[in-house]
């Protein structure tokens, strides 16, 4: 199975053991394993999405232009950019979609974020609108 290295880990926040679905998602999203107090940890899906929600709501984002219609900025294609909603790594095509639809990337806490196809389709998760940080 492709998530075996994550199968026996616990979530870094809620301390629950990862089930097979969360282990596979960690593998697909290339989540790095962290070591806390001598234990290896990853993150479950609900904690990851809650953490990303807090990041979007507590820290105001800064827009980053992905490049003009004819030429993408070189850093966009070579750097890892994660989805601001689900935490997955954006593919080359997903980065291109940002450029072609003139949708900005956003920086939260020095990390560039965008939206993946799954979080874009059917309007389930709308583009980020800059709002003041919650007090």
From Swiss-Prot:
GO terms for biological process: DNA-templated transcription; regulation of DNA-templated transcription; symbiont-mediated perturbation of host apoptosis; symbiont-mediated perturbation of host ubiquitin-like protein modification; symbiont-mediated suppression of host innate immune response; symbiont-mediated suppression of host type I interferon-mediated signaling pathway. The keyword Heme does not apply. It holds the Pfam family E6. Gene3D superfamilies: E6 early regulatory protein. The keyword Secreted does not apply. One of its GO terms (cellular component) is host cell cytoplasm. Keywords: Activator, DNA-binding, Early protein, Host cytoplasm, Host nucleus, Host-virus interaction, Inhibition of host innate immune response by virus, Metal-binding, Modulation of host cell apoptosis by virus, Transcription, Transcription regulation, Viral immunoevasion, Zinc, Zinc-finger. Coiled coil: none annotated. Forms homodimers. Interacts with ubiquitin-protein ligase UBE3A/E6-AP; this interaction stimulates UBE3A ubiquitin activity. Interacts with host BAK1. Belongs to the papillomaviridae E6 protein family. This is Protein E6.
């Amino acid at each position: 199975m492709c998530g075996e290295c994550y199968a026996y880990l616990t979530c870094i926040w809620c301390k629950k053991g990862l089930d097979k679905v969360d282990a596979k998602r960690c593998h697909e999203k290339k989540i790095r394993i962290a070591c806390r107090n001598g234990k290896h940890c990853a993150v479950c899906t609900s904690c990851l999405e809650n953490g990303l929600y807090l990041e979007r709501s507590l820290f105001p984002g800064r827009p980053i232009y992905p490049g003009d219609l004819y030429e993408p900025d070189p850093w966009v294609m070579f750097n890892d950019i994660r989805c601001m909603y689900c935490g997955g790594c954006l593919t080359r095509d997903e980065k291109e979609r940002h450029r072609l639809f003139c949708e900005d990337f956003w920086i939260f806490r020095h990390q560039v974020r965008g939206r993946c196809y799954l979080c874009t389709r059917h309007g389930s998760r709308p583009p980020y609108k800059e709002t003041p940080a919650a007090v």
